[in-house]
Amino acid sequence: MDEDGEKHVLTKRSSFPESSDKNSGDEGDWVRRDLPESLLFQVLLNIPTKDLVKTSVVSPEWRHLWRCVPGLDLDEADFTQFDTLVSFIDSFLSINRESSLNKFKLRIYCNHDRDKETNNAHMARWISAIVEQNVQHVDLTWLPVEVPPILYLCESLVTLRLCGVVLANLEFMYLPLVKVLALEWVIFANELALEKLISGCLVLESLRFCKCSLDNVNVLRVRSQSLLSFNYYGPSSRDLHFKDLAVTIDAPKLEILKLSHQVTSSFIIKKLSSLVEANIKVEFNFCVGKKFNPNDLSKRKMILHFLVAISRVKNMTIAASTLEIIYDYSRCEPVPLFRNISLLRVEFYQDRWEISPFFLESCPNVKSLVVESDYYTKKRTSILSRPRRLLSSLEYVKIKSSWDKLEMKLVSYFIENSPVLKKVTLCLDGCSRKESVVLRELLTIPRRSSSCQVVVL
């Protein structure tokens, strides 16, 4: 122990082939580093346990160091037999039963021939042990094993990630310190079980939810006064097992919203006054052989309220499939204005460029626009006619695409209708046309902004 009361550890000089210290001895000597034990363990916590075990050959002083690291990060694939994994975990938890545990991360993807009762018994034993050790971070992937109730009453837990496990309908869940909650392919007893889990996280700041067809959740209700970030996503394969899915969000402090699930029918969101960033890829279930119906007033009302709820966002990424539905909606009634948007990113997976200019008219203060597409087709669609108003705030445009004549029409649209445009960046990756031809066409476009610079990459 030194003057600060911190233990120091010995590390081998492996980074330097030679030492400038004449008294340091040979290259293979051990050198005492001024690295406190607490800081060393903090670094080692970020290394998988299988790699930590390898450090035991570094020196005699490191032989048992990995046993003292307050965390486990294990993958079943690193063990030739499941029983060996079980023994390893049991041994580690037993050795450290009097110490606090920072992290418990376990990935088991297949049950093989093991019976359900045995798996649940292992899970119950380990969860009970880590809760007693005041674990702070839990990351469990085990298909499909039931997590014991004691985990949902862990008052030391800060982050919780569950994947593929089963969650029973408990009467009470209390996780007073959990700030990060990630639920992927989790099977819930019912919707109420999920609601209790979310509401039981009293200081929740980040929620990630991956939808699966067997999770028993048709209506996802997110109510949190502390939530800052919400990410909702699911498979894009148009799974026909999904029926009448809905998401309701009541999170007044939400700053980041990511929605990516085409077959969810309804999103009911209370106005998000603090929203900074949104990534929207939803189709309101119009993707499964359904089309927007102007006579469906309830659907139109839902879309309107959805747009109003996110209209205060500052930076938005939006999919072309979502824009297409908004475009269809706009034929029935006006689209709300997105006055706060400064950066707009549009991701095209279909050749529907004409819907981009229409939405820009609803973003009167947008300064930067990024248009991306990795889709190429010989099909041609027409850009909308000249805008009802100029793009008076647009300063920067970047277009990344396979590039053809249609993109040139889009570039012309921006250059001709943006009076304060400063820079247009064109990425010609995968372009079948000669760069010289593209450059000649660019020179013929009349520029409304005299200071506009066009850069071709």
UniProtKB/Swiss-Prot annotation:
Domain of life: Eukaryota
Record protein name field: FBD-associated F-box protein At1g66320
CDD domains named in the record: F-box_AtFBL13-like
InterPro entries associated with the record: F-box-like_dom_sf, F-box_AtFBL13-like, F-box_dom, FBD, FBL13/AtMIF1-like, LRR_dom_sf, LRR_PRU1-like
Coiled-coil region list: none
Domain FBD stretches: 378-428
One Pfam family in the UniProt entry: FBD
Transmembrane annotation, as ranges: none
PANTHER family for the chain: F-BOX/RNI SUPERFAMILY PROTEIN-RELATED, PROTEIN WITH RNI-LIKE_FBD-LIKE DOMAIN
Region of interest: Disordered: 1-29
Biased composition range(s): Basic and acidic residues: 19-29
Domain F-box: 29-75
Gene3D superfamilies named in the record: Ribonuclease Inhibitor
SMART domains, per the entry: FBD, FBOX
